[in-house]
A protein has these predicted regions:
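Short alpha-helix capping/helix-loop boundary micro-motifs
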Residues: 11-16
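Short peripheral tails and domain-boundary helices/loops at the edges of structured domains
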Residues: 46-67
Length: 92
């Protein structure tokens, strides 16, 4: 069974991200190859992984509507002093 990929894109970042993440950074999670393309700090990864896993496996996740009309999930990094927002979407 072929699974989907999930793309995480930084859509907002304020202050100083200690990991150096910037708006536009992308990470692809591929369940077929078990590979991750790109980089994501451990703090953002551990907090976003349940939502990423649910998206990849057809789980129920709260969605927002992106500018292109597609459904996306949003996730906030746990660093409250330097907020970073990820947009999570399924890619083929």
């Amino acid at each position: 069974m072929s699974m989907v990929k999930v793309k995480a894109t930084v859509i907002s970042q304020e202050g100083h991200c200690a990991a150096g993440h910037r708006v536009g950074d992308e990470v692809i999670f591929d369940w077929d190859t078990h590979e991750i393309e790109g980089r994501l700090c451990l703090h953002a990864l551990y907090s976003a992984l349940p939502k990423i896993y649910a998206l990849a496996h057809g789980g129920n996740v709260a969605y927002a509507t992106a500018e292109d009309g597609s459904k996306v999930a949003r996730h906030a990094c746990p660093d409250g002093y330097n907020p970073l927002i990820l947009e999570l979407r399924i890619v083929e």
